[in-house]
């Protein structure tokens, strides 16, 4: 699943450890973001290997307008004004006002809401958005304090803040990108399998509670806002997307971001920057790859071999 995220090296490893009798079923959307690392595995495979396109949207109701809206975008078309509705809202503002507007929208209805940004730095980046949202929404939450080598320390994360894990920890069943909420700071009743001291609890999006121990401290970050690469593969009831004139925001970025929403999309920025992002060719268009050529050559050899055997 989410095969558009598979890079060439990962796919090579998967193929290398299997036999010729193994069959792969790749499920993904080639219109979404290209893999972070090299290659365009799914993007090229669907142009060579027979594939099936699933065109019935399950994440959003057709009546919400979101499926039609995102179809326009993936075709490179700017949605017409009539396509904006109570489920798809553009909050037009200047770049300098984006952070304030995003924070106000989040505070008005934080439950089920995720802010998705293109970058960490900048006026619309997750760093400043997380800082501002914490100040406005949770300034009195208990700070996460701990002792290391006998010295007191603290993380700028407070009780009831949303958090995200940024590294895999297979021993604890945690994956990079797992979201949760920090709870019970200094009062955790949970213990790890090694009876380590728990500084707090983290309630995962699944409802499961896990103890926050020292070994996980460098693994968590604030998650009022997250980058799209962390959000890809996930879905949220409501998303807030700050939009600027940034080259990272291309057609596939906008399409991938907006399709994370289940019921409501709130775009913050100017219509001109939003339109430019839709018109900007996806980064995958500029990648130089060779997989398609190799696949076509292999298919041709296979076809010639079967023709020879038949004759």
PLM regions and their residue ranges:
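Walker B catalytic acidic pair
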Residues: 1-2, 28
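Short, well-ordered alpha-helix to beta-strand connector turns
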Residues: 3, 21, 49, 160, ...
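Short amphipathic alpha-helical segments
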Residues: 10-13, 37-40, 127-130, 253-254, ...
């Amino acid at each position: 699943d989410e095969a558009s995220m598979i890079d060439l090296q990962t796919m090579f490893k998967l193929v290398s450890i299997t036999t010729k009798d193994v069959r792969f079923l790749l499920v993904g959307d080639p219109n979404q973001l290209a893999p972070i690392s090299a290659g365009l595995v799914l993007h090229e495979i669907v142009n060579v290997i027979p594939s099936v396109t699933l065109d019935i949207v399950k994440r959003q109701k057709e009546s919400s307008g979101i499926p039609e809206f995102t179809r326009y975008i993936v075709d490179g078309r700017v949605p017409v004004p009539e396509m904006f509705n109570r489920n798809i809202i553009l909050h037009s503002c200047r770049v300098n006002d984006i952070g304030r507007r995003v924070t106000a929208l989040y505070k008005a209805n934080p439950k089920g809401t995720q802010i998705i940004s293109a970058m960490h730095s900048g006026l619309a980046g997750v760093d400043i958005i997380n800082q501002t949202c914490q100040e406005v929404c949770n300034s009195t939450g208990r700070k996460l304090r701990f002792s290391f080598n006998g010295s007191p320390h603290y993380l700028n994360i407070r009780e009831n803040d949303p958090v995200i894990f940024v590294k895999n920890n297979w021993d604890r069943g945690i994956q990079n990108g797992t979201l949760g909420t920090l709870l019970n700071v200094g009062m955790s009743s949970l213990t790890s399998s090694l009876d380590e001291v728990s500084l707090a609890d983290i309630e995962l999006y699944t409802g499961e509670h896990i103890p926050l121990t020292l070994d996980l401290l460098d693994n968590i970050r604030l998650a009022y806002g997250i980058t799209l690469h962390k959000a890809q593969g996930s879905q949220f009831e409501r998303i807030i997307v700050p939009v600027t004139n940034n080259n990272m925001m291309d057609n596939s970025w906008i399409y991938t971001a907006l399709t994370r929403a289940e019921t409501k999309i709130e775009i913050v920025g100017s219509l001109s920057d939003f339109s430019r992002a839709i018109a900007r060719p996806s980064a995958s268009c500029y990648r130089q790859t060779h997989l398609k050529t190799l696949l076509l050559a292999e298919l041709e050899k296979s076809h010639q071999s079967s023709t020879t055997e038949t004759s």
